[in-house]
Amino acid sequence: MPHSWDYDAIVIGSGPGGEGAAMGLVKQGARVAVIERYHNVGGGCTHWGTIPSKALRHAVSRIIEFNQNPLYSDHSRLLRSSFADILNHADNVINQQTRMRQGFYERNHCEILQGNAHFVDENTLALECHDGTVETLTAEKFVIACGSRPYHPADVDFAHPRIYDSDSILSLHHEPRHVIIYGAGVIGCEYASIFRGMDVKVDLINTRDRLLAFLDQEMSDSLSYHFWNSGVVIRHNEEYEKIEGCDDGVIMHLKSGKKLKADCLLYANGRTGNTDSLALGNIGLETDSRGQLKVNSMYQTALPHIYAVGDVIGYPSLASAAYDQGRIAAQALVKGEATAHLIEDIPTGIYTIPEISSVGKTEQQLTAMKVPYEVGRAQFKHLARAQIVGMNVGTLKILFHRETKEILGIHCFGERAAEIIHIGQAIMEQKGGGNTIEYFVNTTFNYPTMAEAYRVAALNGLNRLF
């Protein structure tokens, strides 16, 4: 006799990974519940991560654009805005996103349960509701999509009113004139751009020898130069010895002997999976030191009926990839296997000011692999559209095979880079000889557009061949 479960599947977390899994499951006829500990759906992506930080970035970049526009060069009309004002714009976007995502669940008859869940046994969850009651829920299968949170070292006092992480920085209500950002990864670099754009002094502490080392070196160097040119002070190969919170700010002691003082500190060095509250020990599931779970190609954990997607499984830790992972896991969960899979070359978008985006191999990787590649470049300052809108800072670089003309990598630095990259990505994904740099020479682009950079870069690269 078949077992009677409350649900076919329970999804823990309503971020991009959880949403992708839940929507994929209900579309296949499964009875699904989604558990969310926060009072709104959307997860960290919507409330503390991607959406608010990008909304902040957009507001700041528009202020910079206004102040640098020669039409408004009368200094009596310089535009200024407080961090609190800009946060209001982010709140508006968050509310729109939340309402939209809540609608997805309601239209698809997917039940949302609020509270903190933990495993009792392999098929049972205890749900601690916000009113203090505890419910017991059973399901045949589970998807863990509980996301991640900023890493908190034990010797840093995050309760201090001037010490923030990348979540709590969104509740910053004073106006700092000087900020220390510890950690020069994607989050640290994005917030360095935002604060510097608001005319705040920034000390960016990098524990490594260059910024964003996973990027093509030219892109990394471009960002370093742009930061230097805008007044961001970058300190490479540094680690903190001690962090002191004061009444009027923060003092950071570095292991190199240096001391820095600023109005506040943003600690942005690493993230950890939100698995510690799930009581995974009750079901024999183990996480690594960062609270992350190991999964196979179908996103199954060591227990085949429990799947995991999103930040909780580590790389690539992107909202876009998490949604796809959830969708693939849903297919595997219902059908026993997944025909869909993540694409090999996942695009990266970094929302600094200006943006950076890339897909495929870097020059350093191709050189190490001894692939005979050539480079085609287009400078934004030579494009009519860039000149019209004043977006002269930036470049598009296409790496392609000298003999087959196959596109191997695309790297873009400049405004709208994260949008521009997808034109090249679409051609890179073509099979049967469709992936060729000659496509950009043989097609007709609207004029004037930023997309035209592909034609300029393709001609530049092909002209290097002999």
From Swiss-Prot:
EC assignment: 1.6.1.1
Entry GO terms, CC: cytosol
Cofactor binding notes: Binds 1 FAD per subunit.
Keywords: Cytoplasm, FAD, Flavoprotein, NAD, NADP, Oxidoreductase
One annotated GO molecular function: dihydrolipoyl dehydrogenase (NADH) activity
Co-factor(s): FAD
One Gene Ontology biological process: NADP metabolic process
Binding site for FAD: E36, R37, Y38, H39, N40, V41, G42, G43, G44, C45
Catalysed reaction, written as an equation: NAD(+) + NADPH = NADH + NADP(+)
Compartment(s): Cytoplasm
Alphabetized InterPro entries for the sequence: Class-I_Pyr_Nuc-Dis_Oxidored, FAD/NAD-bd_sf, FAD/NAD-binding_dom, FAD/NAD-linked_Rdtase_dimer_sf, Pyr_nuc-diS_OxRdtase, Pyr_nucl-diS_OxRdtase_dimer, STH_gammaproteobact
Family: Belongs to the class-I pyridine nucleotide-disulfide oxidoreductase family.
Annotated function: Conversion of NADPH, generated by peripheral catabolic pathways, to NADH, which can enter the respiratory chain for energy generation.
Protein name, as recorded: Soluble pyridine nucleotide transhydrogenase
Organism: Citrobacter koseri (strain ATCC BAA-895 / CDC 4225-83 / SGSC4696)
